Amino acid sequence: MWFKNGVPTLGELTVESVAGTTGNTVITVSPKPIGGHKLVYKTAASTAPSVAYDDDLSKWTEFNNGDEITATNGHKITVAEVTADGKARKSGSADVVSGE
């Protein structure tokens, strides 16, 4: 957990999107989630979805690091590391690169 002036703050993830099969991208994230946490993502056409510490992201899509997911080339993706109950702890964004 990161703190700024005694207040918990959102940590950072490095997110990479590389072309997968047609219409898909392979998403890799570092660092890997800590024990008990999981990765979730959300895409948007023009602006990467924003995340704040402790946001409830339980409605976002869960995935495993290195998975191939369906996403539109050129869209934005935000990946977050969340607690078991979906509370945001880290996030990062990237431009989607999908296979053509």
Give residue spans per PLM region.
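Extracellular fibronectin type III
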Residues: 85-100
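Proline-enriched interdomain boundary motifs that mark the N-terminal boundary
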Residues: 8-16
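Extracellular recognition modules
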Residues: 1-3, 76-82
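Short coil/turn motif common to extracellular beta-sandwich-like domains
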Residues: 18-29
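Solvent-exposed loop/turn segments flanking beta-strands in beta-repeat/beta-sandwich domains
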Residues: 32-52
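Solvent-exposed strand-loop boundary residues in beta-sheet-rich modules
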Residues: 6, 44-47, 83-85
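Surface-exposed, short loops/turns at beta-strand junctions within beta-sandwich domains
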Residues: 63-76
